[in-house]
């Protein structure tokens, strides 16, 4: 839509983007205010309308359509992590519910690392969406360059980056992994394994850091504690196959295993049983995510609960706040804390008697 100064020719008209730049707010906020739509604070609306009156700006004959769409952009580098459909379905449920509650509609699109990213970003930048939630689970730092100058309100979900600091909503992975490992330490386990994904993403790196933090701190409590790392694939089939190969050659299995996520944990539990190991009598297991399958395993699996719908909800709420206010002199990182769900896969070890 064009906005023109009263009494001036149409070729002197200014766009809504120019008006937004003049006021230091987003074009979406200007459009919302000038069209009497909900979605911005009353203070921002009053500021925009007052400035528009002062500058003699009025609506042209043409009417601009305000975008009612939020774009959920899923970045796929390899797709191996997104195979965990129970986790991501719950996150997307939180997004879609909140988008609807706030009066918007949801668009879902995919960016593929093996396609022309420049063209994909160009198409997104000229689209009519009000803002973007970037599901960045599989992204690495080198991928961020495509989104730095997007020109739309943006919230990154489920990852964070050293080289780029937009608004971000993530799991507190370090806290969750630390709590899971402390659970095993406090249960008396002296030889603990970290079953980690061979696919590197920031979530798994942080879980590794939380695991090592707990192990390192415990060294001061007991010097005889040991740990090992077991690398497996991130899908059900590859985790199962890799654990099978590991068990075929292992001579001294840890008494407890912390798994990077529940998909890996469930597959590895199945393979452990097929190799004759009893859970938790022979080996204890703690997963991460608390997907529905984790409480129908036999025995029911102890795991780290992630409030998955809350991840999506907070991402939408943060994005809508940016759309409404426009001004942004800082970015924020929201970490969603986890809780440990104690079920039936952790054995309390007997304390050694006096020598």
Predicted regions and their residues:
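N-terminal helix-turn-helix DNA-binding module of bacterial transcription factors
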Residues: 1-66, 353
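Alpha-helical recognition/docking segments in bacterial nutrient-uptake
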Residues: 2-7, 11, 68-182, 246-252, ...
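Non-catalytic positions within long, well-ordered alpha-helices that form the structural scaffold/packing
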Residues: 21, 125, 185-188
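Hinge/beta->alpha junction and helix N-cap segments in small-molecule ligand-binding domains
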Residues: 77-90, 108-115, 169-179, 195-244, ...
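Short helix-capping segments at alpha-helix termini
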Residues: 101-102, 216-224, 249-252, 274-279
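Flexible loop/turn connectors
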Residues: 244-355
